[in-house]
UniProtKB/Swiss-Prot annotation:
GO terms for cellular component: cytoplasm. This is Probable dual-specificity RNA methyltransferase RlmN. Pfam families: Radical_SAM, RlmN_N. The gene is rlmN. PROSITE patterns: RADICAL_SAM. Binds 1 [4Fe-4S] cluster. The cluster is coordinated with 3 cysteines and an exchangeable S-adenosyl-L-methionine. The keyword Kinase does not apply.
Amino acid sequence: MPKKTDTPAYKPSIYSLTRDELIAWAIEHGEKKFRASQIWDWLYKKRVQSFDEMTNISKDFIALLNENFVVNPLKQRIVQESADGTVKYLFELPDGMLIETVLMRQHYGLSVCVTTQVGCNIGCTFCASGLIKKQRDLNNGEITAQIMLVQKYFDERGQGERVSHIVVMGIGEPFDNYTNVLKFLRTVNDDNGLAIGARHITVSTSGLAHKIREFANEGVQVNLAVSLHAPNNDLRSSIMRINRSFPLEKLFAAIEYYIETTNRRVTFEYIMLNGVNDTPENAQELADLTKKIRKLSYVNLIPYNPVSEHDQYSRSPKERVEAFYDVLKKNGVNCVVRQEHGTDIDAACGQLRSNTMKRDRQKAKVGQ
C-alpha cells in the first residue's frame, strides 16, 4: 500500500494506487481480483471522475470506495489558452496549495508538462519555479491527476484528441520526489491504463547524480533530460546552486553510467541567457564537455522566458543563439533550438502560479 509521505492528511486519490495496490486493496475488502481491473478500466480508459459512474460495480463497494478515496483531488482554478494551442492550467490541491500544468501542441501530438512538487528548493537563479520554496512533495496520485484533468479537458471538446506524450519538467525537482515520480511513471505507462509509451515520456533533473545512477537501474525505458545550462563548474555553480553539491565531474560520471546501463540517449537542456552563458567560447566548452558521450546525447537550446523577479537576466538575441548553435554543429553536436510555446500567456514555468499567489495576497490585504 502507499507509503506515508509529507503530504497532509486528507482523503487520498485512488490514482495514488498502482494497479497491483488496487488489486490488493480490493481483495483485502472482500472483492475478487477482477473487480480491481474493472475499476482500473473505469478510471483510465473510460476516465470517469466519480465512483458513482461505475455502473458494473455494486452500490456497497462504491460506498466503500467513496468512504476511502476521491477520484481526482485537484480543483481547476485558471485555464489560459495561447494562440498557438498551448494551454496552461492552475490547479488547487486539497490543502489549498497551487500547482501548474501545461499542455503543448506538438507536430507529433499532445504533450503535457507535469509538476511534481509545490515549490522548488533547487534554487536556480533564473527560474520562476523556485521563487517559492518547496512546501511539499506531490504524491503520485496528484501527479497522475494532472494528466487526467488535461485529458478530461479535451474529452469534453469531443474531438477525440488524446494525451500522447508527457514531460516531467514542471515545478519541482522530480528526483527529489523520487518514489512518487517512479510510481507515476509506471502508472501512466501501464498497458492496461493510459498506455503512454515509455519513449513518449521524458523526466528532467537538475543533476542529482546519485539519483541518476539509481534511475539507471529501475528498468523504466523513459527518456532522461538534464538541466545543464552552463559548460563549466564556476558558471554553473553561480546560476545553479545544485552544482555545488554535484559538480560536473560527478554529474557526468553518473550520466555516463546511465548511458552504459540503459543504452539510452540523454538530452541536455541549455537556457540561453544573454551575456551569461551564450558566447562562442561557452559553446566550445559545451562541445568539449559532451564529446565523450556525443553519440548518445543531444543538446536542446532554450530561449529564455524573462521573469520579473530575475531581471538580471534577459533572452539571448537570435544572432547569439545562431552563433552558439553553429559552434556546436561544427563540433558534431546533435542540437536543436527549442520551439517556443505559449509566449502570449504566463509562459515561464511557475509564472502563472507566482502571479496568482501575488494577486491572492493583494486581495487578502484589501479585504482586511
